[in-house]
């Protein structure tokens, strides 16, 4: 019920407004529908749904018009939700044969699904939230990790453990001055 009640069909959350301004109405609506983005008092709700479309939790975040996060996040947990977290976007895995890409932030997964639709874009939610137990659920898939700048070495350990591919793009772009320290793949795509 909370998922349906929060669904941002009118693009009212600050993040949906950013998507609208950046990519236009059709693509913004596509992202809201694809990822089941919600709206809670103007803040976006990034719902975590597993492959069975069971709600695990909802991450509530405020964004400015520039698409930058404004404050710390909070969580919504339904009475009957499964408390064990999953990847943001995990519900998309069985809807496509595309390879999987994992990034840190939910915002980046949404943006990259527009900028590079040749992957199913998932987010782990934080640099330290790419955890081995979560990776086991996707080991049989073709997976590429896209760590933020300065996280390559940390994520490489997980990539090797699970035989995932890993991109060094953010490290290269940082060395060439294309992105700032701690930026991610979406920062590069939005500025180029």
Each language-model region and where it sits:
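TOPRIM metal-binding catalytic domain and adjacent DNA-binding surface shared by DnaG-type primases
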Residues: 1-56, 92-95, 165, 192
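Generic intrinsically disordered, low-complexity segments enriched for polar/acidic and small residues
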Residues: 4, 12-15, 20, 32-33, ...
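Compositionally biased, intrinsically disordered low-complexity regions enriched in proline and serine
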Residues: 8, 16-19, 24, 36, ...
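Phosphate-handling DNA/RNA-contact segment within nucleic-acid enzymes
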Residues: 43-141
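TOPRIM fold recognition
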Residues: 51, 97-98, 109-192
């Amino acid at each position: 019920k909370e998922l349906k009640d929060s669904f941002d069909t009118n693009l009212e959350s600050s993040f949906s407004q950013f998507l609208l301004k950046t990519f236009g109405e059709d693509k913004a609506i596509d992202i809201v529908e694809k990822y089941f983005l919600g709206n809670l008092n103007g803040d976006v709700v990034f719902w975590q749904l597993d492959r069975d479309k069971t709600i695990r939790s909802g991450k509530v975040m405020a964004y400015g018009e520039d698409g930058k996060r404004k404050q710390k996040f909070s969580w919504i947990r339904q009475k009957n939700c499964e408390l064990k977290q999953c990847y943001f976007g995990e519900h998309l895995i069985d809807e496509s044969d595309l390879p999987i890409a994992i990034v840190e932030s939910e915002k980046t997964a949404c943006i990259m699904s527009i900028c590079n639709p040749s992957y199913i874009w998932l987010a782990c939610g934080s640099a330290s939230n790419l955890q081995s137990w979560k990776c086991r659920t996707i080991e049989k898939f073709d997976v590429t990790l896209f760590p933020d700048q300065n996280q390559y070495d940390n994520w490489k350990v997980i990539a090797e453990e699970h035989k995932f591919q890993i991109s060094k793009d953010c490290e290269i772009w940082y060395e060439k001055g294309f992105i700032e320290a701690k930026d991610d793949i979406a920062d590069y795509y939005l500025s180029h």
